[in-house]
C-alpha cells in the first residue's frame, strides 16, 4: 500500500517547490510521455490558465514524489474549453456559471511504478484517489458540475468510480 498525501491550493498558497515540481511533472506527463504540443520552458509546463486564481490538487507519495495533479478553473473566468476548444461542445453554449468548474491537466502517472503506460494513469488507485479528492475540493468551492476536455480514459475512470459523465460531443 502506497501512502498518498494530497495538497490543494493556489499558486499563492502552495509551497513554491511543490509548484515547480507540479510544472515539471506536467511536462513529463503531457509533453514527454503523451507528446502534446504545449508551452514548455526548461522542462516546466504552464499555460495562460495557470493564474493566481487557478486551483490545484496535487498528490505525492511517501517519498514526496508527485504522483498526480489536477487543475480547477471557474467557468466565470477564461478557461481551456471555453477559450481554446469551444468547438468540442458540439454547438452547446459555453458554460459560464459559479457552480460549473473546469477540470484540466488531470494526470496520475507514478513514474516509479512498474508500469507507466499512458492508459494506466486513468485506472490506478492514485487516479481514483486524485479524482475523488478533486471532486471533493471542487464541491467545497461550490461546484455542482465539472467540465473537462479529456481523453476517453477519463470518462471510463469517472464511470468506474461511480460518477455520472455526459459527453458534450463525439470522442
Protein language model regions, located:
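Short amphipathic alpha-helix that is part of the acyltransferase structural core
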Residues: 2-48, 56-60, 66
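Homeobox/homeodomain signature
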Residues: 9, 20, 26, 62, ...
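Short, Lys/Arg-enriched charge-dense amphipathic segments
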Residues: 22, 55-69, 139-146, 167-171
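Long, contiguous hydrophobic alpha-helical segments, chiefly transmembrane helices and signal peptides
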Residues: 22-23, 30, 56, 70-72, ...
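Conserved donor-binding loop and adjoining core beta-sheet/short helix segment
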Residues: 42-91, 101-108
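Acyl-donor binding region in acyl/amide transferases
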Residues: 78-80, 86-171
